[in-house]
Amino acid sequence: MRRVFKITFTVVVAIVLIFSISSCTEKVPKIPELVTGFSGNADVELGETKLKCNISHTEKGVSSIIISSPENLKGMSFKNLGGTYAISYNELICETEKSYLPSSCFAQAITNVLDKASEENGAIYQKSEDNNAIFTGASKSGDFTIYADSKTGIIKKIEIPEINFTANLTDTKAI
């Protein structure tokens, strides 16, 4: 009887030890996939300039940015059609096969960051904090930080400190 008790006790202790050791392993957080194909609105600050715009961007690099505020620029659009670029305002359209916008232009900065983030390893996950997944990378417009929803991967904010650029995105939906 004592022998059966010792064997049973040893088995129970072994099982408890196995479960306690396995529960101590650190759980690696799931890294969200960054969603670069989306449409939404953005409040943009570039130095002293403040703009509101509508943004649409695909993972293939096709983008459209239309200014909605200030009133004197309302309706101006910047489009990258995957090799063809177009700027339009009040029925005036300039279309070219090369982007002539400087990399510090707000529309070019947004496009540069989103295009880079669409590339494999173009935006590197750094950490998660306050329900934000934080990604960093380098684009033609400068080093950037992207804040995305840690569950959905939808971009909420883009920063490029070198050109004093911030874009806060709202009403964003994956496309």
Feature names for model-found ranges:
Residues K6-A14:
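Sec-dependent signal peptide recognition
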Residues R2, K6-I7, F19-V62, N72, ...:
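N-terminal leader/targeting segments and the immediate start of mature chains
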Residues P29-L34, F38, I87-G142:
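Flexible, processing/modification-adjacent segments and terminal tails
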Residues S64-S69, G122-I175:
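Gly/Pro-enriched, hydrophobic low-complexity segments
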Residues H57-V113, E162-N168:
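An acidic-aromatic
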Residues P32-E33, N54-T58, F78, N121-S128, ...:
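Short, exposed beta-strand/loop patches in secreted or surface proteins that constitute
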Residues A42, G83-S88, I155-K157:
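Short polybasic amphipathic segments
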Residues T36-S39, N80-G83, K151-T152:
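A short, compositionally biased
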